[in-house]
Amino acid sequence: MWEGRGNGMKVTIKKMGINGEGIGYIDRMPVFVPGALCGEEVEITVTEKNGRFAKGKLVRILRRSPKRVRPICSIQRRCGACPYMVCDYEEQLRFKQEDLRQSLIKYAHVDPRKIEPIRPSEKTLFYRNQCKLPCGMAEGELVNGMYMPNSNIFVPMETCFVHEKDLEIMRKRILKVLNRHQIRAYDWHQKRGLRFLILRGFHGKFQCTLVSGEEEFPSAMIEELLALEGMHSLWQSVQTQKKSAELFGPKMELLGGERYLHLQMGEITLPISPRSFFQLNTQQAVAMYACIAELVGDRNALVVEAYSGIGGISMALCRQAEEVIGIEIVKDAVLNARACARDNGIDNVQFLCADAADKLLYLSKKRSIDVLVVDPPRSGLDEAMLAVILRSKIKKVIYVSCNPSTLSKNLAVLQDRYDVGRILPFDMFPNTAKVETIVELKRR
């Protein structure tokens, strides 16, 4: 069956992969096919094969899924950021629910009946409050775009349909100004030019960061950008390291405007800096924070939030708990969070700058912690944090995850001392394969 590699081969797609690709089987070997949907029969060209799996390029669809739709985005297939834009929204939710279900069963042996129906996003398009787009050149002009998956091929973008509409309007206005001043895309040899345009918006106000080489932008251009309606702050970040995983460079300069962009969440005002992490779907973030507050429950509780960042979750819990302690290792984020608590007149929340596992171990020996909230990166909780949680006597853990695989593997460890309670998935990123999940764990 594998002879004639590169020629058309027929595959029936049996399920969806964690990155939104279709998975079929040839001689019992899984074949990953981006762009194919569950139930479809497709013709592919095999592009890669090893001892465990193969990858295929979709040539044509022989039998279409009834759930397939025409994507609104003309570069959807080449961009690769929104693999589920080719199927209707109900099917997207079903895929995500099933991905979470299979992962929890496989790694953590969780009773799937505990998984509640995924909370859909009110918006399926135009929902992202931030864009982080690379820059390139097209027909002599500076443009934004995306790189094709697993390549250095730049695909110019006219409109991104998952960014909020006013964010897209502002992005295009910024590009016009940059082109009027003949700003060019980054040149690796000269180490000059613009690498990324980063834009975040709340309540009609915008924070723009230009990630560039070592150069000084024209003062006339800066003045013109700051004069754009809604421009709240303008930053420059110098990043010349080619292989750095960090989007921002070590050098950040405020070119004009206010240092922080402010987000109103109920009665709380959150100051957001360019490096601050905040969920990209504002409405779903508010819904998730409300769910976490509900799970905390007891208004007399001591709550500790590990990896607290700028303190968004901690702030959301300040009126739910008697005392909240946030732990974050990034100093700027801690200073940001402390300023937020001070500006909002909140006196029952404190933020500590420390390694999360080390400080949690110390606190758990000194205090009786009722609830621990963890919202780790995609890599999940490390061994040190898992060990501290298991050794502690924390009554309840609320685990917020953006990765079903690492979540499930962590739960497999934590179930040595904790019982899994409610499992609440949220669709934070419509048209992508990603799913956010909140899991309640109760100490036995």
Protein language model regions, located:
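Extended interfacial segments that mediate partner engagement and assembly in macromolecular machines
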Residues: 59-71, 78-187
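Internal alpha/beta scaffold segment
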Residues: 153-195, 214-242
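Short, solvent-exposed loop/turn elements at beta->coil junctions and helix N-caps
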Residues: 116-123, 194-196, 424-428
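Terminal RNA-binding accessory module
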Residues: 1-75, 350-351, 358
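Rossmann-like S-adenosyl-L-methionine
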Residues: 2-7, 18, 22, 217-444
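Short, aliphatic-rich beta-strand segments
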Residues: 201-213, 269-273
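Short, acidic/hydrophobic/Gly-rich beta-strand patch recurrent on exposed beta strands
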Residues: 22-27, 145-148, 337
